[in-house]
């Protein structure tokens, strides 16, 4: 007996493997949710005031939700780039988009705080413009890397080009910080952007993160079959 006599065997094996992966993913997702909920109740002290405790729980819930969305965006972006460029080593940090996004966000903050004197359009704050700078910086950095990489170049050449520009953008970011170091407030904001923080996350930041992350993940979810085909390569 072989697979040719029973063509359904490979299909059933593939279905079983998908079920196993789905089960593992389900358990991991459940573990993440349970861990996030338990983290809300872990702390160094106990708040006796019920109103203050409710307020504190609300703050921690917003921060946990924003951190969850940020982690989902980082993991999804890595998988998407691995599929698009057909290389398991591809990632936003290697291709330069992470450094480009950081530089774009920092330039936006410098323009708002130094050039415009923190003058943002009515109804909008500086923090609302930071994601715009990050998105523009990441897109421009990726476009530059793709334009400077030969059309028929190997994926390794693309990764090397991205790594070079990632170092260049990181150097420009360090130069920008050194130029504005006399303003300790702006320097603190730039360092917070570089290192990442959810300390100031609230309902508005959560809504903004949800729109950006879910809006980007929806097309990726709809094109998951195409990404799988790209990741499989020409031989398979």
Predicted regions and their residues:
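Alpha-helical transmembrane segments in inner-membrane proteins
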Residues: 2-236
């Amino acid at each position: 007996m072989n697979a040719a006599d029973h063509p359904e065997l490979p299909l059933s094996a593939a279905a079983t493997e998908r079920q196993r992966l789905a089960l593992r993913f389900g358990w991991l997702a459940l573990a993440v949710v349970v861990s996030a909920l338990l983290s809300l109740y872990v702390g160094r002290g106990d708040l006796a005031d019920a109103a203050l405790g409710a307020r504190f729980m609300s703050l921690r819930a917003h921060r946990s939700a924003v951190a969850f969305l940020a982690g989902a965006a980082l993991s999804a972006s890595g998988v998407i780039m691995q599929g698009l460029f057909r290389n398991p080593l591809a990632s936003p940090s290697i291709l330069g988009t992470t450094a480009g996004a950081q530089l774009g966000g920092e330039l936006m903050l410098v323009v708002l705080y130094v050039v415009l004197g923190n003058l943002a359009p009515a109804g909008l704050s500086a923090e609302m413009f930071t994601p715009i700078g990050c998105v523009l910086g990441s897109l421009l950095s990726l476009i530059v890397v793709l334009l400077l990489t030969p059309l028929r170049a190997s994926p390794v050449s693309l990764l090397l080009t991205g790594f070079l520009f990632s170092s260049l953008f990181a150097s420009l970011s360090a130069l920008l910080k050194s130029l504005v170091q006399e303003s300790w407030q702006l320097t603190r904001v730039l360092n917070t952007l570089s290192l990442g923080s959810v300390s100031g996350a609230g309902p508005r930041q959560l809504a903004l993160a949800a729109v950006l992350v879910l809006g980007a993940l929806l097309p990726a979810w709809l094109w998951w079959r195409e990404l799988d085909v790209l990741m499989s390569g020409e031989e398979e």
